A protein has these predicted regions:
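Conserved, structured core segments of small domains
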Residues: 1-123
Length: 123
């Protein structure tokens, strides 16, 4: 039985864009994970200036266009893995971080979170 994990890549709002060499290294790793049946999906996100934030507070919904200057860190990318254990998801995350060594000078953090199973149909 496998479990799905989402890895959430956190970086600074003003982080540099990845170099072509880094994109190539990440793509190669994603292809390797896909060949092994571990990778479901992965991708990078545009800066928050291209996005919006929706919030529910006190029964009211507000939407704010980016950028979000108050954010110290933002989500820069994600990956979804279908693996046998949290340890395997962490191993793929380590490989992802290792791919950045020498190609990314800024701090990077990746959160590994197990995804909930979808509810059964007809419930």
């Amino acid at each position: 039985m496998t479990m799905r994990f989402m890895t959430i890549v956190k970086t600074r709002e003003n982080a540099e864009q990845p170099s072509p060499a880094l994109i190539q290294a990440i793509t190669k790793l994603g292809e390797e994970a896909a060949k092994q049946g571990a990778m479901v999906e992965f991708g990078g996100l545009l800066p928050t200036a291209a996005g919006a934030r929706a919030r529910l507070a006190n029964g009211k919904i507000t939407v704010t266009d980016g950028p979000f200057s108050e954010a110290k860190e933002v989500i820069g990318g994600f990956a979804v893995y279908d693996v046998a254990s949290k340890q395997e998801a962490i191993a793929w995350t380590r490989k992802f971080l290792e791919a950045h060594i020498g190609l990314w000078k800024q701090e990077l953090e990746v959160e590994v979170r197990q995804m909930m199973d979808a509810p059964a149909q007809g419930c």
